[in-house]
Amino acid sequence: MTADKDKDKDKEKDRDRDRDRERDKRDKARESENARPRRSCTLEGGAKNYAESDHSEDEDNDNNSATTEESNKKSRKKPPKKKSRYERTDTGEITSYITEDDVVYRPGDCVYIESRRPNTPYFICSIQDFKLVHSSQACCRSPAPAFCDPPACSLPVAPQPPQHLSEAGRGPGGSKRDHLLMNVKWYYRQSEVPDSVYQHLVQDRHNENDSGRELVITDPVIKNRELFISDYVDTYHAAALRGKCNISHFSDIFAAREFKARVDSFFYILGYNPETRRLNSTQGEIRVGPSHQAKLPDLQPFPSPDGDTVTQHEELVWMPGVSDCDLLMYLRAARSMAAFAGMCDGGSTEDGCVAASRDDTTLNALNTLHESSYDAGKALQRLVKKPVPKLIEKCWTEDEVKRFVKGLRQYGKNFFRIRKELLPSKETGELITFYYYWKKTPEAASSRAHRRHRRQAVFRRIKTRTASTPVNTPSRPPSSEFLDLSSASEDDFDSEDSEQELKGYACRHCFTTTSKDWHHGGRENILLCTDCRIHFKKYGELPPIEKPVDPPPFMFKPVKEEDDGLSGKHSMRTRRSRGSMSTLRSGRKKQPTSPDGRASPINEDIRSSGRNSPSAASTSSNDSKAETVKKSAKKVKEEAASPLKSTKRQREKVASDTEDTDRITSKKTKTQEISRPNSPSEGEGESSDSRSVNDEGSSDPKDIDQDNRSTSPSIPSPQDNESDSDSSAQQQMLQAQPPALQAPSGAASAPSTAPPGTPQLPTQGPTPSATAVPPQGSPATSQPPNQTQSTVAPAAHTHIQQAPTLHPPRLPSPHPPLQPMTAPPSQSSAQPHPQPSLHSQGPPGPHSLQTGPLLQHPGPPQPFGLPSQPSQGQGPLGPSPAAAHPHSTIQLPASQSALQPQQPPREQPLPPAPLAMPHIKPPPTTPIPQLPAPQAHKHPPHLSGPSPFSLNANLPPPPALKPLSSLSTHHPPSAHPPPLQLMPQSQPLPSSPAQPPGLTQSQSLPPPAASHPTTGLHQVPSQSPFPQHPFVPGGPPPITPPSCPPTSTPPAGPSSSSQPPCSAAVSSGGSVPGAPSCPLPAVQIKEEALDEAEEPESPPPPPRSPSPEPTVVDTPSHASQSARFYKHLDRGYNSCARTDLYFMPLAGSKLAKKREEAIEKAKREAEQKAREEREREKEKEKEREREREREREAERAAKASSSAHEGRLSDPQLSGPGHMRPSFEPPPTTIAAVPPYIGPDTPALRTLSEYARPHVMSPTNRNHPFYMPLNPTDPLLAYHMPGLYNVDPTIRERELREREIREREIRERELRERMKPGFEVKPPELDPLHPATNPMEHFARHSALTIPPAAGPHPFASFHPGLNPLERERLALAGPQLRPEMSYPDRLAAERIHAERMASLTSDPLARLQMFNVTPHHHQHSHIHSHLHLHQQDPLHQGSAGPVHPLVDPLTAGPHLARFPYPPGTLPNPLLGQPPHEHEMLRHPVFGTPYPRDLPGAIPPPMSAAHQLQAMHAQSAELQRLAMEQQWLHGHPHMHGGHLPSQEDYYSRLKKEGDKQL
């Protein structure tokens, strides 16, 4: 007995030990599996498979044990002394199973079942019953026998598959070969339910929560304790048992508030069907019972007078009794009418048939019949008026439909909520009716409220079956799989020596260095201690860490090295590895993991906060694969677990160091993704963080697509989601950009790797990692040296796409990609050419980083993160091997840069991976170049420079880049400068290798870049500056500064204007060493970019996927020598660098000074404008007074003249030209108080100036045509003319019509007379004549007075020999038809149409002749001239009275002719021999009066003395020039085009006249 007692004691001790090990093992097993392993669907398949596997539990444990030796020791230490046994009833039924640890399992118990994979939690089930199966049935070879007490059979669980053994073969039916199996019914964890199903459940719960209290599942701990019961039964070996648990049932989510998250406790509310993948609650179960029924009081009808109860609220809608025959005839008639109406509306018989066959047509007919008291005749008469009822879709406005669809998406089919929140004007019944109409429309296919049942299997989290599992089994993996016991064996490590061997281990979650055993587990397969592993296996999540402990120093040595290397190797490697798996993972988005790869508390929070796939935190690709794509749309695959881990470590460290923990916690805002501390420079860090999002890969499906397309592996950052929305939008934009963006010259990109010669800017020193982008941020600054940076990661970074810097999202416009600064400076220079390609590249999207070629220059370690970027090199760039040569880089960069622009995605943030990791895509930070996008629109020349800009735009986060980023912010317009190609990207980098492609690009850019979206790039002038400075150094010297004429004069111009020439030069130099010579500190550069932006706040973000509501924090994030980086908005996990972060230059910095100067300048301009405005008002008042007086006089004179004679006006005041400005003469382009505008002329400016003219807007001058010239002797006389007709507009209308008819007749008569040889009028003699002395003058003058026919301002305009009869007729009728009642906009429109009509007159031979007279100075003079004569008629819009000279009418001629200083008509001036068309000449401001001495009178009083003097000088010079030109003109009459036969006589005479005069 004593021996037996001793044995029992020993057994109990052993059991205790085993129990502990078992517990550990269970927890380990449940560590981190993304998807639940397959479950066998055959009853005994699990046990059978397990038995056939012929392996012991020990062996399973050994597979995952820390070392082989330890495994061997474990095996040796497992004697068959630990016995498990079961109890039976007399009938042979097994009532309980007792393990060696004395844990008793009975049918009905809820238990944990081992899951084969270490990263998958235990499965949870309830035991239905036990049964013994003989080994022969299981085809199993039994291990060594174990012995047990006679009364029961023993099952040695730990060492071998349980076996029913009895010492002497006793035990009812027991034998050594028996296996104890159990039937279990599964419970599913939320991570084992398809994400699509669970998310809809969460949505429903949220929508139905009217209690005002938060649901219990908002607590992440309780959320993970919810299970879903199922009816699915499976058979497992008893050896798979890993402990007992408690599962409570609650009727609904509200009742679950009572649940307490105790140890081993769970709850369930709903059931789950693994076959259909549906939850009971969402599958339309029949909701019966008290909980689903409304509680209504009994009906209490109103008493009727006679005492009987009635229901007064019923409405009779049909009375049977109509004979079927009559009813059918009536319906046929109704349908016929409907068909006819449908045909009339739709235009085809088919439409009619559709209308007739609709149910609502029939219902409407029946309702009408009922309302007509069943009188078919009356009903049909009523139907004639409305045979077809108004369709439901016609009753809903577009806005209402949008709201309805929004409500469906937000609240599901909760129509009460939709009505309450979004459509209060509609009845709930209308919503339901409309829903059934809407769900049949094509739009509903993509917006269905709940399509959970149609989700593809792809989204399931259940993993693929293995060969051993039937394909159609939806259940858990066969028991054999579970018995693998991924965790170390349960009783291993018993001995001290085994623990000693493990002293070197440390848990990657809690960092403890003491544990019974060590096994990889958790969703990320990290090394865990026993406690953490078991907690994960039980609850599906790692335990929260209450007191964070610093990780042992030895844990992160490798990471530290990478960090130290800042070369970006680490990041690159990470990115590369991640990127390599560019495909999406099926699992939900991953959680970032802590440096050691463990899930940090932050990560844990993140994980708990959002549904993650079982392996959400897992970095390993395996895990992710296992994950079902719960949030596949939001998540990008993460490849290479290790790289990710290192990246994560870096990130985490940085987060803690830089207080970015918050960001990390909030899923590390995109900016933060890249650990700031890690980034070479803080600023860069920021930017890299933003990029890091890119690292993760945008979670946005679009982003993902882009990643895939780009072929560069997307770099999913742990926080993939964050970057999602923004980067996705941005990427989409980028994608939209022409593929060209890809930078056709990608090959050259690598070279830019900063020519070795170019010293990398010290500033950039730290930027080694992708962060370099930040340097780019200060692009010029560090860039020059850092060009090297690009060099640094020569190859790598060259390809670095700079994935879309954060800005990219903002930069949706092509040009942001424009200059992915990412390429080293040289790259930037090269970039210009590539830019075009960039455009095309757009598709690669921010993640395009791939450009596999990466120019993997071993090249410098690429201190910058850029190196990683190489991988960014778009696929197209892949060739960028050229990058290998730093100098070549320049070209290569171009292509690369092109690519980069394309992917400015914020992914840039990817932390600088050590250069060593060229493959890894550098964070797209480099993309800063994107920045150009916003600014690009300003100056093409900056293209080369833009790279830097792009950087800026893309890198808002990096402090150095701050200015740029802010710039980009300011320039969100970048979106508008869409095409990165802004230069005709057609320009080949090749233009000159020496010349950085960027330069070439600039050259290629059309100076007018601004004119086209593409130009947008050029327009980036402000941006240019940055690129110019920093990049130039990097780029090959060949590149000329954008400002240099060689490059592209236009681009240069803009860039120079926007920034110091030096910087411009640098920019153009791109990689030109000169850039350094223009000593623009990198910081400066970025500052300049900021300058451009001028505003610290970033512009509103471009459209992007939804993100958390931002909260204003305005906390300083990072500081550099010249600026401070502020975080303005906090969006939780999803942050946008362009709107959430901004730079503020430090007080003494150059940028601050520039901004102050800009502000001062703006103030001065505003004050000046205010003064001018006041002066203008005063002038208007004075002019109004004068106008009123003159109008009264003119009215009297007009009446007198009209009554005296049809067209003859004796009053010289009203001489033809007197009261009219030349047709389409734009009112003075500027106001007298404003100095003349010497610059290019634009129609928009002229139009604005017209509106600004005081007299134009004068109410008393409403009817004055803007194109009419003023009287030479009295410029304001015309202002009084409207008074003649203001009394009664209809009178004027009638008069105008009558006069027009009379004048036409007279003109025709005159034309006939003019054709007679004797009738000629010589201009020299005409000048001195008073208009009234000419017998025909009254007609011309009269027609001028009657504005519509306006033949011309000059009295003899219609009769000048220079006009052929047809031309005169046209001119007489050509004037715009202006009516008194016309509004100013209408008048302007009429005049514009008139100008266009006049453009057709250029076919006139004389007009063509005059076109030959265009001289180079015309254009120049036009600018001066048109702005000097402020209030005189502007020749640009002349033309009502004569052919519009191409030089006069900008609509007719090209830009060069926009401001031809004089009309093509003759000058009534003695200085000229045979004048051009006088009627046009007189309209010109210079010749508005007969003689120069009259000039002052032609200038409105508001004109200053200085302006008048200028005008006089200009007139004098113009007259002399015109006189000379006129002589030449008439000396070459043969140059005019052919003329009509009717003109032969006239032209022959004209030629003779010219000969005589000459």
Curated annotation (Swiss-Prot):
Boundaries of every ELM2 domain copy: 284-387
Function noted in UniProt: Plays a role as a transcriptional repressor during development. May play a role in the control of cell survival.
Chain positions found as Phosphothreonine: T120, T593, T1111
One Gene Ontology biological process: radial glia guided migration of Purkinje cell
Region (Disordered), start-end ranges: 1-90, 464-495, 542-1125, 1154-1238
Annotated SANT domain residues: 391-443
Annotated Pro residues bias: 806-823, 902-932, 1027-1053, 1098-1109
PANTHER family assigned to the protein according to its UniProt record, in alphabetical order: ARGININE-GLUTAMIC ACID DIPEPTIDE REPEATS PROTEIN, ATROPHIN-RELATED
Location within or outside the cell: Nucleus, PML body
ZnF endpoints (GATA-type): 507-532
Compositional bias segments (type: Polar residues): 465-474, 709-720, 778-792, 1012-1023
UniProt biased composition (Basic and acidic residues): 1-36, 624-640, 652-673, 688-708, 1154-1198
Positions with biased composition (Low complexity): 479-488, 609-623, 726-752, 824-857, 865-874, 891-901, 962-972, 1054-1077
N6-acetyllysine modifications at: K1150
Residues where Phosphotyrosine is found: Y1251
Cross-link (Glycyl lysine isopeptide (Lys-Gly) (interchain with G-Cter in SUMO2)): K560, K637
PTM sites of type Phosphoserine: 53, 56, 142, 304, 594, 600, 613, 642, 656, 675, 679, 1098, 1105, 1107, 1258
Protein's recorded name: Arginine-glutamic acid dipeptide repeats protein
Compositionally biased residues, Basic residues: 74-85
Subunit architecture: Interacts with HDAC1 and ATN1. Interaction with ATN1 is improved when the poly-Gln region of ATN1 is extended. Interacts with FAT1.
Domain of life: Eukaryota
Keywords of this entry: Acetylation, Coiled coil, Developmental protein, Isopeptide bond, Metal-binding, Nucleus, Phosphoprotein, Repressor, Transcription, Transcription regulation, Ubl conjugation, Zinc, Zinc-finger
Domain BAH: 103-283
